[in-house]
Design a protein with these regions (language model features):
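N-terminal and secondary-structure boundary signal
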Residues: 2-346
Length: 346
């Protein structure tokens, strides 16, 4: 015999509703954290290089060849190299070194790229041609017969953002980047007075066209630097990073810091993991870098236990950089156990 239906009292209804709402709230609060700590295991390569006069081409080619998924994109494909060209201040290591760029061009060609393009959209100085000439990159382009594209002036198309941390729905991206088979971010190993560090993810600011967003891309700065970095990276999904750390910059980067002989090249196909490794090499903590944390729900890895080091060990390569003076977080202050557990699943 079926039991009679029982009328739910107002008190019981509120209890049930409260439990349900609490469950929904808890689930919505925990879900991003669970997604964040489910970081993929990835490889990051550290190469020991103490001079730009070394045979960088062979080292880079061997390093890149350790990433089979990248080799597939290279062979017969169009590769866009995005160096870090900020400005030209003599005797300051502001930019990706021309020798590093030349070696990378040669390495990708040897690995089967049909076309290699160098592209950059500087945000600090509007005169891209002057920066390319004075930095020594112009001669490399001539010697290697490589086309250069000023991304500040390139044709562009508005693209729907993936992460939308900036609360923007779309950002204009240049056709040169959108039409490539592989985008390679080639930053300098530097500190940054606002973002903490400027590495492969921050370097992507230079793909945003100045003709749409001004100089120094102020429209995106107003929507948050870290948020903009993450929105750009999650949307164009660059495939590889090569960090020029043979000579880096510490202190008041990215323009006024001091040079550091850090003697490394760092590379990998998970840009967040590459940057997290570079941050540790500099003596800082990835858990303190906001844009790295924002990348974690989108496949970015900062958990050291999920980053397999290839080549040199992190411990043998580490050099303690002076932190930037203005950055809002103490990037050289070790986070607590609970902080690390909360942000990276330790």
């Amino acid at each position: 015999m079926y039991s009679k239906s029982r009328k739910i009292s107002r008190r019981d209804f509120l209890k049930i509703s409260g439990i349900g709402l609490a469950g929904v709230f808890l689930g919505s609060a925990i879900a991003p954290w669970i997604k964040r700590i489910q970081q993929p295991t990835t490889n990051v390569t550290i190469l020991r290089e103490d001079s730009y006069q070394n045979n960088l081409e062979d080292s880079l080619r061997r390093g890149i060849a350790q990433y089979p998924n990248i080799l597939k994109k290279i062979q017969g494909g169009r590769v866009v190299l995005k160096p870090n060209l900020v400005d030209h201040y003599p005797n300051r290591p502001l930019n990706t070194h021309p020798a590093m760029l030349a070696a990378t061009i040669a390495a990708f060609r040897q690995l089967g790229a049909q076309e290699v393009i160098v592209a950059e959209g500087p945000g600090h100085n509007r005169d891209t041609e002057m920066i390319v000439e004075q930095s020594g990159v112009s001669q490399i382009l001539k010697d290697e017969r490589v086309r250069f594209v000023d991304l500040n002036l390139d044709d562009c198309t508005p693209i729907e953002l993936v992460s939308r941390y900036t609360q923007l729905s779309r950002i204009f991206f240049p056709h040169t980047v959108l039409g490539s088979d592989l985008v390679v971010s080639m930053p300098k190993l530097k500190t940054h007075h606002w973002a903490g560090v400027t590495l492969s993810l921050k370097n992507l600011f230079g793909v945003i066209p100045g003709i749409k967003y001004g100089w120094p891309k102020n429209f995106l700065h107003w929507h948050g630097i870290s948020q903009s970095i993450a929105d750009i990276a999650t949307t164009i999904a660059p495939g590889f990073a090569i960090v020029d750390g043979i000579v880096g910059m510490e202190g008041d980067g990215p323009l006024h810091g001091a040079g550091v002989d850090s003697n490394v090249v760092i590379m990998g196909d998970n840009l967040t993991a590459v940057d997290a490794t570079a941050v540790r090499l500099m003596g800082f903590y990835p858990e303190r870098i906001q844009h790295l944390l924002l990348m974690m729900p989108y496949g970015g890895t900062i958990n050291e236990m999920r980053i397999k080091q290839i080549g040199e060990s992190l411990a043998s390569s580490q050099i303690l950089f002076q932190p930037p003076p203005v950055v809002m977080t103490n990037i050289n202050q070790a986070p607590s156990f609970w902080h690390k557990a909360l942000v990276s699943g330790w």
